[in-house]
Design a protein with these regions (language model features):
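Active-site neighborhood of divalent metal-dependent phosphoester bond hydrolases
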Residues: 114-131
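Select subsegments of transmembrane alpha-helices in polytopic membrane proteins
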Residues: 144-156, 231-238
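Membrane-interface helix/loop boundary segments of multi-pass membrane proteins
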Residues: 207-209
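Short membrane-interface loop/juxtamembrane segments of multi-pass integral membrane proteins
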Residues: 132-142
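Loop-to-helix transition at the N-terminal end of transmembrane alpha-helices
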Residues: 45-60
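Hydrophobic transmembrane alpha-helices
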Residues: 2-32, 56-67, 71-118, 159-204, ...
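Short, hydrophobic transmembrane alpha-helix segments
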Residues: 12-15, 36-46
Length: 327
């Protein structure tokens, strides 16, 4: 029996949800541990954000293909000739035996697009700047630095909960659902809007920083573009896109046939469970950005630098912290 078959056998729980959830979360912590060891030894944070993006990509792909891998390699049903399902099949010939559902492909793709875009942006930024000031003190302590990687594995796992749960649904269960639901449209619309907002904010900030390095302006803090309507427009975009993913996933997971297929109990427990699995993602992102590592760290830094400046005080007073000022 190969190592892969052994791992599949070890995680072959009765519950379809656990059969996908446990290996996916375990993979997140394993990947982070693999990057943590050399980073701690070298006291170097250069690959921290890159490892986060790679973990998102790997865990998403694993959760999407895990049912097919089980069908291919589990000893009781092993069939080496079984090929992995096509990502295009849900759109060209939906409903095939063992085929993925279009919702699984689209939401997994949404995560992958986001992870590639943000990961490349952050990796390019640290290559240009040479370091990440967040880790100036943390990387000196092996325990604290290891904790940062552990926290990142937790971040990935919680953010991906709605996608992991959706990808755990057996293919046959989707036949009981309509081809398209209002929650699909709403969730994808919120995701696209949030993704566009985050991209625009990051590009505006990158251009502003580049122009400042080139002496095109002497502004000390950014108040133009999306920063004129929100103090943290990139965070607003990120919270929004994860809310969109959660909404689209929850609209499917809350259906009774899907809950039965996942092995969840009836009554109110099933809907509450899938709603919690879905919305823990944007809830955790909001908590992390607004209360832990995002806004508090940035605000402390900028208040210390510019807190005595009248223009900075006016900008903080007149600009919403998160939700954009539309009018």
């Amino acid at each position: 029996m190969s190592l892969l078959q052994s791992l599949l056998h070890l995680t072959n729980f009765k519950s379809p949800l656990l059969r996908t959830l446990v290996p996916a979360v375990s993979a997140a912590y394993a990947i982070q541990a693999a990057f943590a060891l050399p980073s701690i030894f070298a006291q170097n944070e250069r690959f921290y954000d890159f490892s986060g993006s790679l973990t998102y990509l790997s865990v998403t792909a694993l959760s999407l293909y895990l049912p097919a891998l089980r069908a291919k390699y589990t000893p009781t049903v092993a069939n080496a000739s079984t090929s992995l399902p096509s990502l295009l099949a849900p759109f060209t010939s939906p409903g095939g035996m063992g085929a993925l559902n279009w919702r699984q492909v689209v939401l997994s793709g949404a995560v992958i697009f986001w992870a590639v875009r943000l990961g490349s942006y952050l990796f390019q930024r640290i290559l240009e700047e040479g370091k990440d000031s967040r880790f100036d003190e943390i990387k000196k302590s092996p325990a604290r630095f290891a904790g940062a990687f552990f926290a990142q594995a937790t971040w990935v796992s919680l953010c991906l909960m709605p996608v992991i749960a959706l990808n755990a649904v057996p293919a046959s269960a989707f036949a009981a659902l309509p081809a398209f639901k209002a929650s699909d449209a709403l969730g994808l619309l919120v995701y696209v809007a949030g993704f566009a907002f985050e991209i625009t904010a990051d590009r505006q900030k990158s251009r502003w920083l580049r122009e400042r390095r080139e002496k095109a302006h002497d502004e000390q803090f950014m108040t133009s573009g999306l920063w004129s309507v929100s103090q943290y427009p990139n965070y607003f975009g990120e919270i929004s896109l994860w809310t969109g993913i959660a909404t689209a996933a929850a609209g499917t997971l809350v259906s009774q046939p899907i809950q039965v297929a996942l092995g969840l109990s009836g009554g109110v427990t099933g809907p509450l469970t899938v709603m919690a699995l879905s919305y823990v993602s944007p809830a955790f992102v909001s908590f992390l950005l607004l209360k832990v590592s995002g806004v508090p760290l940035s605000e402390k830094k900028y208040d210390k630098r510019y807190g005595d400046r009248k223009d900075y005080q006016e900008w903080k007073k007149n600009t919403p912290k998160l939700f954009p000022k539309i009018f």
